[in-house]
């Protein structure tokens, strides 16, 4: 062809063999890349009456020790000012944080199996914080990618009166007095404590451990021990082995967990269920264990594991279980669990509690 002479038009070539096959992975990779860039759609909040509602205070969900000190020593105005100045700094995770993350992991599994079901966990932030502090709380929740859409910020007033309106199945707080108020209102509640050291817990299975007497069951048997001693207690339990114990404050929460477990069982996933429950009791198996198990059976409930310690410390066993939370009515069991790295929660119910004074000692208010 001479220089400057126009080229003759050429017909398009047919793609060679294997060209489509070679291009397919490229397009698949590009699709995955752009899908990941798209904002992920958040799940829809369930109706409160259909969900298992867990209400947590801000000091249970996040560590707010420094802020609480400012509130106590310098007052509410300085506290709010400090929160506003630091509202873009997320709080550190608090003792209830791993528990909440585990609840959300269960929700993801439930939504995979039952996309339209509202029978899931619904987490509510229940706090007496001022609404101005809400921005920092929201920023912290978004920072950790938590799905908490329901807030109740009462501006210094007790939030306990709102718990029933939110259909609360369990209330966790760092404020012991508010927990006692909730228990008195018939709501399952516990004061949550940070462990003395951090322990890695399961990211895929929610593990919840319960004491028996005065937690799942009433304090009937503990009253016998306190009044008449262990020998009389063993006689009493043997004589009443086939009489179910009355329910304790957290029976309803175990029932709610069992309801969600059955949704996995019905899909043939009993062994792969992302919820596992434990009964961890100081009872002896041979002398007083049968009544505890028969009581659960009479309620149509069960725990995945039942551990009878016959008075031995609970901390070492809990260290092996690594639950996200352990509920007990006696503070020395709570302290023993803390020492072994377990997040423990005190249920202030029953005869084991320190008698209240008629004129309680004045406590500094807390910013929950």
UniProtKB/Swiss-Prot annotation:
EC number: 3.1.3.5, 3.1.3.89, 3.1.3.99
Swiss-Prot/TrEMBL keywords: Cytoplasm, Hydrolase, Magnesium, Nucleotide metabolism, Nucleotide-binding
Chief location category: cytoplasm
InterPro entries linked: 5-nucleotidase (IPR010394)
Molecular-function GO terms, alphabetical: 5'-deoxynucleotidase activity; 5'-nucleotidase activity; IMP 5'-nucleotidase activity; magnesium ion binding; nucleotide binding
Catalytic activities: a ribonucleoside 5'-phosphate + H2O = a ribonucleoside + phosphate; a 2'-deoxyribonucleoside 5'-phosphate + H2O = a 2'-deoxyribonucleoside + phosphate; IMP + H2O = inosine + phosphate; AMP + H2O = adenosine + phosphate
Cofactor: Mg(2+)
Protein name: Cytosolic 5'-nucleotidase 1A
Native source organism of the sequence: Homo sapiens (Human)
Lineage, opening ranks: Eukaryota, Metazoa, Chordata, Craniata, Vertebrata
